[in-house]
């Protein structure tokens, strides 16, 4: 297992399994875990709670400039704090899911959150960071860059199962439509579009179990550590 400082950047679309896999890997590595997607979801929830239309760029930027967000980087914790309240379940709801791409596409919002993400990763020493532009924009010098993906149908089924387990009312067709819509928005936005970094390893998780994905990523991490040690 790699020793010393380590940054692992894991990107990919919604439902690719990033959060589950990264939590497991961070625990195995004794590292911190940073879910940057949750940060954008918190920003979106904050905007919606203020009654702001996500298309009102000026109002969104002003509302998120000093976001009352507290980040828990313990991989065993799913707690996400907005203004003193755990919103870990609410940020996964359909309303936030429908609007997060619009908020995340705003340049000033991304600049503010990217600065925070870089600061948190730098101070963590050992950190597994997941998102959509970590390897390509946020942490371009990360020694390990991985892009997790899967078919839209598989990702929708995973997200649907998560919603059902969390007691959120939905149906598979609606979730699939949301997944495809978000793929389109995230891939075509002008600021940090969703795409693998040029030096990232792409891993398709469509037919892999969680353990198989974890094993694949741990192998990539160990190989990177071996190359660095030479």
Swiss-Prot record:
One Gene Ontology biological process: pyrimidine nucleotide metabolic process
Protein name: Cytidylate kinase
UniProt keyword terms in alphabetical order: ATP-binding, Cytoplasm, Kinase, Nucleotide-binding, Transferase
Protein family: Belongs to the cytidylate kinase family. Type 1 subfamily.
Pfam families, per database record: Cytidylate_kin
Intracellular or extracellular location(s): Cytoplasm
Record GO cellular component, one term: cytosol
SUPFAM superfamilies assigned to the protein according to its UniProt record, in alphabetical order: P-loop containing nucleoside triphosphate hydrolases
Source organism of the structure: Corynebacterium diphtheriae (strain ATCC 700971 / NCTC 13129 / Biotype gravis)
Keyword Transferase in record: yes
Top-level EC class as recorded in UniProt: transferase
Signal peptide positions (record): none
GO MF term list: ATP binding; CMP kinase activity; dCMP kinase activity
Chain's gene name: cmk
